[in-house]
């Protein structure tokens, strides 16, 4: 809403209506003519498109942002017209907040487009080991509270050793679904972790990516973040541990990648003194130069709505105080995940050429090779022939898509923004590696061994010189790379920016201009953007038909 949520809050959302974005102000709708109704429907579709299928309407608010308000009779009239507009636009709506204006009530209405596929956001959970990330995922997705001894985490563990050690070491995804009224779908199912049923019955799906918190698994955590192209992130910190371990590093990943994030302080059922100290530490870290966020403590449903409204700006950092044992604060977090709109405009990428970085691979009995990954661009269909590669000899091969699953549901096709699993014919399990790509046959495949990048050294204990080696991460691809040369200078130190030529040490990869890279080695870390690639010669790149 265009008012301050509570006394003393740092959040300010006053201001006139913007032409872009998914927020629309309406002072009064009245009894529109047929032509006016058509314009309102077109306008709603535009706002929904701007918000990836979700929008907010402020009823009783002038274009300048003044909270005028509506009388009771006007509220009934406006909502009746609004219902007609929403139905014509193929959307559903609900009032999320109602506050007092100068002359009556101001209503905030959440609108969600009815789509063939559910509206989706991807949200990884980051934070130090033992902060309660997996338990939080387990509680949110099953609706059953934790016993205080990590039982909830075992419900979503991927491997036996994760249950035994009580420590996540891999990347796993779990669906939290919402129906049209904002209620969680998982709670309504016999098996709340049945992804296919959650997906099919939901209007909105939050894909929660559970990641490892231990420093030892940081490479896996980076792969999980980069490979899923998140809309937002939840950075989890335990109240009894504070901002220790990998908390700051994981927070830094969100900052350097430009991912808006919220902080979840767990275990608030323990010592209140620790909760207070941890909250103070988190607020201090969020205000540091380089992070520069406005902390916004969410302790009402109204705050949760506001947090969802403004998280995509990247300016605020909502803070949730939650307990996996008592359930305190979890309803606010669910509301936030339900209302937070998709940040990435996947519709604009659907018509581009297909691009999928392989995130994982499986050998399924009776099926053969199955690979998984997020569609970064384009669309793909069953029986379509695509390129897979590059292989160590810089070649690509033509393979056939035998079947596709999205969220464990068998589908005929998948599109940009969806995480799919696809069975491939024409290539062996041992030949395909994580970090390879699946490309449309319209794409000219290229295998890159060297590239030029603008980099920013976030930290290095001494100086970086030509010959320096680190591990480079690009989406799900990672391998050692060497700095061949530093253009225009001899060395780089902490805080320096420069242009370098880098060479992949083991094998070629599919890289292109504009991609973000992260490089790490020991305590050294940096980020960069590829500005030029040097593909292998055309003769070395070929696509062969699968054997008959």
Give a label for each model feature:
Residues 1-117:
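Polybasic/polar functional segments that serve as interface/processing modules
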Residues 49-51, 129, 167-169, 197-202, ...:
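Conserved catalytic network of the ASCE P-loop NTPase/AAA+ motor domain
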Residues 81, 135-140, 172, 220, ...:
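Alpha-helical scaffold elements adjacent to nucleotide-binding pockets in ATP/GTP-utilizing enzyme cores
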Residues 121-134, 138-142, 289-461:
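Conserved catalytic-core segments of large NTP-driven translation/proteostasis enzymes
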Residues 122-125, 270-273, 427-548:
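C-terminal effector modules of nucleic-acid-centric enzymes and ribosome-associated factors
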Residues 204-207, 211-218, 228-249, 255-277:
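Conserved Switch II/interswitch segment of TRAFAC-class P-loop GTPases
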């Amino acid at each position: 809403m265009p008012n301050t949520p509570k006394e003393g809050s740092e959040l300010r959302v006053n201001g006139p209506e913007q032409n872009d974005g998914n927020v629309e102000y309406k002072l009064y709708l009245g009894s529109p003519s047929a032509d006016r109704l058509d314009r309102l429907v077109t306008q709603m579709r535009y706002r929904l498109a701007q918000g990836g299928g979700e929008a907010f309407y402020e009823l009783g608010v002038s274009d300048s942002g003044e909270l005028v308000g509506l009388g009771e009779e006007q509220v009934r009239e406006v909502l009746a017209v609004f219902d007609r507009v929403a139905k014509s636009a193929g959307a559903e709506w609900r009032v999320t907040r109602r506050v007092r204006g100068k002359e009556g009530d101001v209503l905030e209405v959440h609108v969600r487009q009815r789509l063939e596929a559910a509206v989706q956001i991807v949200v990884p959970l980051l934070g130090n080991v033992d902060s309660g990330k997996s338990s939080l995922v387990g509680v949110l997705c099953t609706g059953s509270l934790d016993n205080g001894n990590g039982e909830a985490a075992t419900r979503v563990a991927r491997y036996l050793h994760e249950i035994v050690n009580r420590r996540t070491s891999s990347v796993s995804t779990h669906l939290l679904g919402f129906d049209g009224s904002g209620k969680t779908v998982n709670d309504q199912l016999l098996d709340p972790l049945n992804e296919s049923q959650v997906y099919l019955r939901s209007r909105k799906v939050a894909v929660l990516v559970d990641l490892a918190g231990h420093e030892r698994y940081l490479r896996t955590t980076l792969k999980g973040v980069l490979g899923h192209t998140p809309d937002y992130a939840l950075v989890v910190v335990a109240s009894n541990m504070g901002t220790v371990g990998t908390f700051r590093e994981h927070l830094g990943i969100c900052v350097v990648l430009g991912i808006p994030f919220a902080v979840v302080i767990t275990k608030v059922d323990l010592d209140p003194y620790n909760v207070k100290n941890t909250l103070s530490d988190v607020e201090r870290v969020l205000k540091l130069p380089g992070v520069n966020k406005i902390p916004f403590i969410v302790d009402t449903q109204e705050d949760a709505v506001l947090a969802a409204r403004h998280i995509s700006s990247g300016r605020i950092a909502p803070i949730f105080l939650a307990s996996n044992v008592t359930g305190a604060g979890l309803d606010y977090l669910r509301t936030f995940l339900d209302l937070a709109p998709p940040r990435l405009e996947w519709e604009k990428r659907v018509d581009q050429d297909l691009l999928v970085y392989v995130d994982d691979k499986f050998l399924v009995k009776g099926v053969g090779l199955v690979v998984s990954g997020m569609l970064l661009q384009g669309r793909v269909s069953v029986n379509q022939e695509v390129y897979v590669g590059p292989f160590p000899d810089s070649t690509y091969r033509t393979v056939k898509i035998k079947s596709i699953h999205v969220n464990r549901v068998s589908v005929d096709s998948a599109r940009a923004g969806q995480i799919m699993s696809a069975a491939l014919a024409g290539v062996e399990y041992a030949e395909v590696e994580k970090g390879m790509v699946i490309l449309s046959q319209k794409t000219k495949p290229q295998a890159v061994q060297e590239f030029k990048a603008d980099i920013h050294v976030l930290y290095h204990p001494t100086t970086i010189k030509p010959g320096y080696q680190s591990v480079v991460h690009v989406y799900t691809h990672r391998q050692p790379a060497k700095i061949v040369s530093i253009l225009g200078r001899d060395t780089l130190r902490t805080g320096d920016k420069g242009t370098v030529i880098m060479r992949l040490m083991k094998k070629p990869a599919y890289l292109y201009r504009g991609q973000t890279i992260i490089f790490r080695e020991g305590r050294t870390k940096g980020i960069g953007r590829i500005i030029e690639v040097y593909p292998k010669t055309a003769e070395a790149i070929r696509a062969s038909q699968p054997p008959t």
